[in-house]
From Swiss-Prot:
<keyword id="KW-0349">Heme</keyword>
<feature type="binding site" description="axial binding residue">
    <location>
        <position position="465"/>
    </location>
    <ligand>
        <name>heme</name>
    </ligand>
</feature>
<keyword id="KW-0503">Monooxygenase</keyword>
<dbReference type="InterPro" id="IPR036396">
    <property type="entry name" value="Cyt_P450_sf"/>
</dbReference>
<dbReference type="GO" id="GO:0005506">
    <property type="term" value="F:iron ion binding"/>
</dbReference>
<dbReference type="GO" id="GO:0016705">
    <property type="term" value="F:oxidoreductase activity, acting on paired donors, with incorporation or reduction of molecular oxygen"/>
</dbReference>
<keyword id="KW-0560">Oxidoreductase</keyword>
<dbReference type="InterPro" id="IPR002401">
    <property type="entry name" value="Cyt_P450_E_grp-I"/>
</dbReference>
<dbReference type="InterPro" id="IPR001128">
    <property type="entry name" value="Cyt_P450"/>
</dbReference>
<dbReference type="GO" id="GO:0016020">
    <property type="term" value="C:membrane"/>
</dbReference>
<dbReference type="Pfam" id="PF00067">
    <property type="entry name" value="p450"/>
</dbReference>
<keyword id="KW-0812">Transmembrane</keyword>
<dbReference type="InterPro" id="IPR017972">
    <property type="entry name" value="Cyt_P450_CS"/>
</dbReference>
<dbReference type="InterPro" id="IPR050476">
    <property type="entry name" value="Insect_CytP450_Detox"/>
</dbReference>
<comment type="function">
    <text>Cytochromes P450 are a group of heme-thiolate monooxygenases. They oxidize a variety of structurally unrelated compounds, including steroids, fatty acids, and xenobiotics.</text>
</comment>
<dbReference type="GO" id="GO:0004497">
    <property type="term" value="F:monooxygenase activity"/>
</dbReference>
<keyword id="KW-0472">Membrane</keyword>
Length: 519
């Protein structure tokens, strides 16, 4: 009994000492940053959906400079916005920072059967990347151009119905319908448009609108209990994962249905034609006995072999799931921000409409027509400079001890780029850094800024977003069709400036617009 009585205070003191050691980690190393609170660190400040994490980080950068640290429970995070250090992380020291910053509640990317291209690392990531990349080649995008245009025309029909009497509409809601419809048709086996009647949309929206803080908090503060909580969370959806579980089951069903269909076709002697969507493309590489390539004693090299270019059924589910979630949200947000900036900068919108009329003469818009819309490219890039989207993706885990600038970085430390500050740094972009100026992208120097690490809307280096070209194609197709017929105008419901909310991504609460029909 006396041993137990002695052990309890000893364990308690050890527990407190450990968390105090983590809490003061950056302070002891002479690195500035917000101290936060014992046990949780600065987590309470970064989990506010009403004031997104990346705006809070931007505020801290103004206080502490281009490199500082803070803790999220036991997670040690280094924030950087120095262009030279950014390039080191993503390019020059890629071998030391090839892992993502993941909350322990998300699982172990080395062991999860459904690890996807976003969370995978090492040889497994290389294999998934090598298999996925052809999906987004120009040749593949040309094949789905007709499908994307059909979804764009379907949305245009709904816009016409909703604005026939001059009503204002929330473009964010409409764009989410478009991206959900498009990704469903090119990645999920959906055969026709389900716009404004897709039962899955509310569940996907809810994933991004989930404001519950206990899930990431438990993972950050009690990492050893994270997998236990994850197990119960997936078994009992009411604990916080109901929406994700529903979406996941839908993807599993879509993949299994396609597998069954292909097997039945083989039995009946029906030849399997060219892949029609992402599921087909991934099933071409399916092999359920594929080896999961793990790193050899923690050693990873950019020149290492890709290994077996095959996917398990579970990995196919993982790829389709991440493409669905990522493709839905980010493209809809980019369209929303672009629309807002066009409405508040009518001279830019007029110039864009002139380009569309000049380059897209035929009623149908081809992939080649889209490639000629250079000014639209500038507008989208400038929009994403001022409103970077999934900045969470611009974070890495230190896999090998190294040095960034004058800071020694230990294994397991998370490094996150303050993209909002980087993208409006006057030393990089000039005195007009905070102004919407698409013409700046006509200057060849902007390409050099990208190469140096000053523009990372789609990431940088080997892990740059694989779906970037698809996102551009979707946006350009839809905007071209809308702006042929309408002009975006600020309405009485339009919030200026936009009210930004969210956690996984930073999004406008609403984007109300008046669409004036062109003569």
């Amino acid at each position: 009994m006396s041993v137990i009585l002695l052990a309890i205070p000893t364990l308690f003191i050890g527990f407190i000492s450990y968390y105090l050691w983590i809490w003061t980690y950056w302070r002891r190393r002479g690195i500035p940053g917000p101290l936060g609170y014992p046990l949780v660190g600065s987590f309470p400040k970064t989990l506010k959906s009403e004031y997104p994490q990346y705006l809070q980080i931007r505020d801290w950068t103004k206080l502490y400079g281009p490199i500082y640290g803070y803790t999220e429970g036991t997670i040690k995070t280094l924030i950087v916005s120095d262009i030279d250090i950014v390039r080191q992380i993503f390019v020059e020291q890629y071998d030391n920072f090839y892992g993502r910053k993941l909350n322990p509640i998300q699982g172990d990317p080395e062991k999860d059967e459904r690890t996807n291209l976003f969370s995978a690392q090492g040889f497994r990531w290389k294999r998934l990347r090598a298999i996925s990349s052809p999906t987004f080649s120009n040749n593949s995008l040309r094949k789905i151009n007709v499908t994307v245009e059909d979804s764009a025309m379907e949305l245009l029909r709904h816009i016409e119905e909703q604005t026939s009497e001059g009503q204002q509409i929330d473009m964010l809601q409409f764009y989410q319908e478009f991206t959900m419809d498009t990704i469903g048709r090119i990645a999920m086996g959906q055969t026709d448009s389900q716009m404004f009647k897709n039962p899955l949309l509310k569940f996907v929206r809810a994933i991004f609108g989930d404001n519950r803080k206990h899930i990431p908090l438990i993972g950050g503060v009690f990492p050893t209990l994270a997998q236990v909580f994850r197990f119960f969370m997936l078994k009992f959806p009411l604990l916080g994962a109901a929406n994700f579980i529903h979406v996941n089951k839908t993807v599993v069903t879509a993949v299994q249905n396609r597998i069954d269909q292909r097997e039945n076709d083989r039995k009946n002697g029906i030849e399997i034609g060219e892949p029609q969507d992402f599921i087909d493309l991934f099933l071409e590489a399916r092999a359920d006995d594929v080896e999961h390539f793990q790193e050899n004693n923690g050693d990873f090299s950019k020149t290492s072999s890709y290994g077996n270019r095959q996917l398990t059924t579970q990995e196919i589910v993982g790829q389709c799931l991440v493409f669905l979630i990522a493709g839905f949200d980010t493209t809809a947000l980019s369209l929303s921000y672009t629309t807002f900036l066009l409405a508040t900068h009518p001279e830019v919108q007029k110039k864009l409409q002139e380009e569309i009329e000049r380059e897209c003469i035929e009623p149908s818009i081809s992939f080649d027509h889209l490639s000629k819309l250079k000014y639209m490219d500038c507008i989208i890039k400038e929009t994403l400079r001022l409103y970077p989207l999934g900045t969470m993706a611009n974070s890495r885990r230190c896999m090998r001890a190294t040095k960034l600038g004058n800071v020694e970085v230990e294994v397991g430390t998370m490094v996150q780029v303050d993209t909002w500050s980087l993208h409006t740094d006057t030393k990089i972009w000039g005195d007009d850094a905070k102004e919407f100026k698409p013409e700046r992208w006509l200057d060849p120097n902007c390409d050099q800024v990208f190469q140096k690490g000053g523009y990372i809307s789609f990431g940088l280096g080997p892990r740059q977003c694989v779906g970037m070209r698809l996102a551009y194609m979707e946006e350009k197709m839809l905007l071209a069709h809308i702006l042929r017929k309408y002009t975006f105008e600020v309405g009485t419901k339009t919030e200026i400036p936009l009210k930004l909310v969210g956690r996984a991504t930073t999004q406008p609460e609403t984007v109300w617009m008046h669409l004036k029909q062109r003569i």
